Amino acid sequence: LEAYASASAVAARAKEQLLAGASSILGPEAQTVTAKRLFEAASQGDVWSLGLIDETADYLAIGITTIVHTVDPGLVVLGGAMNFGGAKSPVGQRFLQRIRDSFRKRSFEYVAAGTTIDFASLGGDAGYLGAAGIARTEYQKSL
């Protein structure tokens, strides 16, 4: 997934396409484009940027489909910087919906029906909260 859906991979694809002549408000920034700038351009309605974000959602959905068919987690939580604004952003909402739709198209129907894909709600504190939860559990075991 890192090769296709990470911030650096998205920026590299954007740079390649912009240098090849893609029509976007980001054209002048081809050499220095970032995933954050792609999100900002998409938020301004840049059609090319939205398309690249959709493509990224499809790549992520392929990875999610593979993982879900392997371990059947029931819940897939997306977090980190590559959520294009998350649930608070129309671009983030579009990104999530595209992932869900692409996942459903690629999955067995019964697997898709039993799987929820959503954004993480804990934000940047998720790691700390998880570590605290593990510490608490281990402490309680020692009593």
Language model regions located:
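ATP-binding/phosphotransfer module of carbohydrate and carboxylate kinases, centering on a glycine-rich
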Residues: 1-143
